[in-house]
């Protein structure tokens, strides 16, 4: 009986330690900037709020800037972070800047309780492209959009 209780206590203690050590997503950001588009956009999602900002960088004034700021709920945040595969995101390889060819650079930043991960233009091969664009779709849906560039 003592042996069983000891094993149970040890298993619970180990489970508690491993859960405490898990990396938790605290914030997700997406930015696009530069190039011929002459505007930049920035999305931020965390457990408190969801924000979007688009602003014109140069040129004739247009209907920009646009700003959206919405409160977030713990339930929504939990569902959002469950959709993100942090391990796959960590494996993405940064791509070269696209501004030299008048393109926009795109950056995704994921902040956790342990570290900040930043990836730029990380869609250079089929595997990376799938992970990258799936994450962009997850972010877009948080704002009721079909795609991040809508």
Where on the chain are the PLM-derived regions?
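Bacterial Sec-dependent N-terminal signal peptides
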Residues: 1-24
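Short, surface-exposed coil-to-beta transition loops
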Residues: 37-42, 65, 102-105
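Short, well-ordered, aromatic-rich surface patches in folded extracellular/luminal domains
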Residues: 22-35, 81-83, 90-150
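Short, low-complexity, polar/charged sequence segments that are solvent-exposed and flexible
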Residues: 46-52, 64, 73-74, 89, ...
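A short, structured loop/turn motif at beta-sheet edges
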Residues: 47, 70-79, 110-116
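Mature extracytoplasmic domains of secretory-pathway proteins
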Residues: 67-93
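Acidic/histidine-rich, surface-exposed loop or edge segments in extracytoplasmic proteins
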Residues: 52-68, 119
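N-terminal export/targeting and maturation segments
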Residues: 21-56
């Amino acid at each position: 009986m003592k042996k069983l209780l000891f094993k149970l206590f040890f298993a619970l203690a180990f489970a508690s330690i491993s859960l405490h050590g898990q990396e938790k997503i605290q914030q997700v950001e997406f930015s696009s900037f530069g190039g011929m588009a002459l505007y930049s956009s920035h999305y931020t999602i965390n457990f408190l709020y969801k924000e979007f900002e688009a602003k014109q960088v140069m040129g004739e004034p247009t209907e920009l800037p646009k700003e959206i700021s919405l409160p977030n709920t713990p339930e929504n945040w939990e569902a959002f972070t469950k959709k993100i595969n942090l391990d796959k995101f960590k494996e993405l390889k940064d791509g070269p800047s696209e501004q030299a060819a008048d393109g926009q650079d795109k950056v995704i930043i994921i902040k956790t309780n342990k570290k900040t991960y930043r990836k730029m233009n990380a869609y250079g091969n089929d595997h990376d492209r799938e992970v990258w664009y799936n994450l962009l779709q997850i972010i877009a849906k948080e704002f009721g959009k079909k795609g991040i560039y809508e």
